[in-house]
Amino acid sequence: MTVLVTGANGFVGGAVVACLARDSTTRVRAAVRRSSVTAAMTGDVVPVDELDMNTDWRQAVQGCHTVVHAAARVHMMQDGGRDSLTLYRAVNVGGTLALARQAAAAGARRFVFLSSIKVNGESTSARRPFRADDAPAPVDPYGVSKAEAEDGLRTLGLLLGLEVVIIRPVLVYGPGVKANFDAMLRWVQRGVPLPFALVRNCRSLVALDNLVDLVRCVITHPAAQGQTFLVSDGDDVSTAELLRRCARAMDTKARLLPVPLALLRTGARLLGRGAAAQRLLGDLQVDISPTRERLGWTPVVTMPDALRQTAMALRARRRP
């Protein structure tokens, strides 16, 4: 069975390629942007141009049974406004649907789409976690574009006989993670005092290994067809507890200061960082019980173990 993985040189896509390559019954084809191709890349690597509605995927999808679509215009904190939504739609909607059409035309049977929990919204309340069957409530351009891509894929699936499977991950962390999570780890490692001792929120995260294992599962699982799955570690934590766990993973102690939440929110608002504060102070939980029950799937790594692996990778990157 040949599986095409897009975004194969990215954080998630690269891990999916590595996982599937360990299965002797699966031939992995890695699609990467033409500008990212290097001489060090080996195996079945297919270069593609910029992702949009005009991308030519014919070489990449030829002979593929399944497509795992991990390539996307990713969420950036500073993105916003109408022009931003246009850019997100071009890649995440137009590019995704063009790939699905060409894959179906080439005879692909299944299309696994890496979406985002942002389709559900930005936060939960009253300890009521998001569910896959909740009405979509995206807030930012990235979430809107992912929701529209999901709708388009469901329609194409019905029209073209393509088995569409959608996965909505929460924040993904693991060895090689970048951006805010990487910055947080470095703050903890350096002993930077952080004002989150009083934060008692509840947030779901997913280790890279757990997300990748779910992708592996839905590629062939008969009960995955036409379904949407939420995924997390099944171990929700507060920001304060997450920082403590990160510190333990790095054999240090988190320096947390007891700053009142109202003061944190006010300060963030005055600095124009309200959205960032919500991610640190607010709740975002997901219910993965339907994922577990329908697929017989369970997370393969615990959060403490995944954080230790992430910390080890961070230390390895810092060595000369």
Report residues per predicted region.
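Conserved Rossmann-fold NAD(P)-dependent oxidoreductase catalytic core, especially the SDR/UDP-sugar
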Residues: 97-141
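Substrate-positioning beta->alpha
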Residues: 177-183, 197-220, 226-230
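N-terminal Rossmann NAD(P)H-binding glycine-rich loop of SDR-like oxidoreductase domains
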Residues: 3-23
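Catalytic helix-loop patch of NAD(P)-dependent Rossmann-fold dehydrogenases
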Residues: 82-90, 124-172, 193-194
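Glycine-rich Rossmann NAD(P)(H)-binding loop
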Residues: 174, 196-202, 229-236, 245-251, ...
